[in-house]
């Protein structure tokens, strides 16, 4: 309040006869006034009394992990929505700075745990570009990478549709989705030895070749999966309850997607056919025939349709991969960069098979020294930086990788699509109903392991 003003009902104190004038030579005089409390009370008095703040999560079955949603609501209407993240922070990016370039694969595969092959591929493509060996990657290794990534896309979308349907009251798609996903995880286990967190894709190629029954397992899956996907599609696509809960819900048009940096099925549901497999191909994707499905619904139902069509396109790509597979190496030949991947592991799983010992120790002393340094110190990557992106089931998964010329990364940063796409929660949910928040978040399909890292 200024010095010349008086509050109502108060008298101004008499001024002294000779007020002391401040010495302003060399100093700045600042007149500080108090808070305008009248304006504050008027603003608060005009607010609606029934507006409350509700925490949805982080322990909630419909938030896809430990996502916390802070909702300010008036009755059933969401006035403001904010995301609270960080509950699954694991410090993976920092840990990579203390591990060799080869060991990093074991860490990054655990970030977005529903699409581990994409984490591994993006990391390995970055290391290979820094090493300048992108053109030396064996063709068989690139084909197997594409095959595994597309199977992983199907398994990830199955989880999205299964959990999204369950959250809206459709229990049967939940059972069907996880039943079909189990078939894909069985194939992963046959090929890599693990259902999740595989660390199978390595800089320079693959950890080892496909097992003898690997191709047969994939072909059995391809024979069964189209019918299973149709059964699941019939449960949801024309379901009147599912359509009522998803159509015109979670609306986000192309302008909003571009402003927020949204990618993946959310962006393609707004009508833009942006797919890195087409615009910036990697692993030979430019040689495969597939379509990029789009819709113009800009809502949860449109994102559901996109994922259904993407699973069909992934099956087409997997079939092409099987037709292209030819015998050959799955790791570059440079022994200074990678140890043999064509040899089977020993019973202890540590590679101590007679074939390994004969190849490494029985060839030459120089080869033994190189292998010892490769295992203990790791490879040295030339100094530089690179950004590599792949099209994951949730959108653009990018890696910014910096090397100082040593055996460990100087910095590895992941641009996870779940983290970016969660910015759209406010735009999708504000002005809608509380029940529609569940459908909107499910249509984004965030994985908190990738968000928090």
From Swiss-Prot:
<dbReference type="GO" id="GO:0051287">
    <property type="term" value="F:NAD binding"/>
</dbReference>
<keyword id="KW-0520">NAD</keyword>
<feature type="region of interest" description="Disordered">
    <location>
        <begin position="1"/>
        <end position="30"/>
    </location>
</feature>
<dbReference type="Pfam" id="PF00346">
    <property type="entry name" value="Complex1_49kDa"/>
</dbReference>
<dbReference type="InterPro" id="IPR022885">
    <property type="entry name" value="NDH1_su_D/H"/>
</dbReference>
<keyword id="KW-1003">Cell membrane</keyword>
<keyword id="KW-0874">Quinone</keyword>
<comment type="function">
    <text>NDH-1 shuttles electrons from NADH, via FMN and iron-sulfur (Fe-S) centers, to quinones in the respiratory chain. The immediate electron acceptor for the enzyme in this species is believed to be a menaquinone. Couples the redox reaction to proton translocation (for every two electrons transferred, four hydrogen ions are translocated across the cytoplasmic membrane), and thus conserves the redox energy in a proton gradient.</text>
</comment>
<dbReference type="GO" id="GO:0048038">
    <property type="term" value="F:quinone binding"/>
</dbReference>
<dbReference type="GO" id="GO:0050136">
    <property type="term" value="F:NADH:ubiquinone reductase (non-electrogenic) activity"/>
</dbReference>
<keyword id="KW-0813">Transport</keyword>
<comment type="similarity">
    <text>Belongs to the complex I 49 kDa subunit family.</text>
</comment>
<dbReference type="GO" id="GO:0005886">
    <property type="term" value="C:plasma membrane"/>
</dbReference>
<keyword id="KW-1278">Translocase</keyword>
<protein>
    <recommendedName>
        <fullName>NADH-quinone oxidoreductase subunit D</fullName>
        <ecNumber>7.1.1.-</ecNumber>
    </recommendedName>
</protein>
<dbReference type="InterPro" id="IPR014029">
    <property type="entry name" value="NADH_UbQ_OxRdtase_49kDa_CS"/>
</dbReference>
<feature type="compositionally biased region" description="Basic and acidic residues">
    <location>
        <begin position="1"/>
        <end position="21"/>
    </location>
</feature>
<dbReference type="InterPro" id="IPR001135">
    <property type="entry name" value="NADH_Q_OxRdtase_suD"/>
</dbReference>
<comment type="subunit">
    <text>NDH-1 is composed of 14 different subunits. Subunits NuoB, C, D, E, F, and G constitute the peripheral sector of the complex.</text>
</comment>
<dbReference type="InterPro" id="IPR029014">
    <property type="entry name" value="NiFe-Hase_large"/>
</dbReference>
<keyword id="KW-0472">Membrane</keyword>
